Amino acid sequence: MGDTDAVVEEILAGYDTITVVGASADPAKAAHRVPALMQRHGWRTVPVNPRGGLIMGEPAHRTLAEAAAAGQRAGLVDVFRPSARAADVARQAVAVGATALWLQLGIVSDDARAIAEDAGLLFVQNRCLSIERRRLGLDAPGPGIGQGPAEGRSR
């Protein structure tokens, strides 16, 4: 699979909800700015932050498992955590049934890639959702398929 432009396009065109692990309530941080920008362009965000509270107007879940227990299917999991934590997040994403894992710009993990790809997840690393959206001219979310996989993708 890998993080080719085709995979990036499949993710950006196939999902309209982003579960953001490491989402921040601080508008000065990329972990707030990027998902907030995606939200303004029509994507729904599900923040995951161990502090809970409200982030970008949405209730933050403390873990991916807590989000899943609250009825939030992970689908696309966007990661704003250090590279050293990415494999743990990948395992959690697989455990809750995610179908795509995106490691933001600066986050690289061969272990996370192996975990995700072995489980059949689409995988991207070291790229920014917002930058890629603009670069590829995709100003709207996917075709309203919610948190599920892209058309024709089983998982």
Regions found by a protein language model. Name each.
Residues 85-104:
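Rossmann-fold NAD(P) dinucleotide-binding segment
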Residues 1-4, 54-87:
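Glycine-rich, highly charged phosphate/nucleotide-binding loops
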Residues 105-133:
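Rossmann-fold NAD(P)-binding glycine/threonine-rich loop
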Residues 18-19:
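Conserved beta-strand elements of the Class I
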Residues 24-29, 35-56:
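NAD(P)-binding Rossmann-fold cofactor-contacting core
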Residues 132-155:
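A charged, well-structured terminal subsegment
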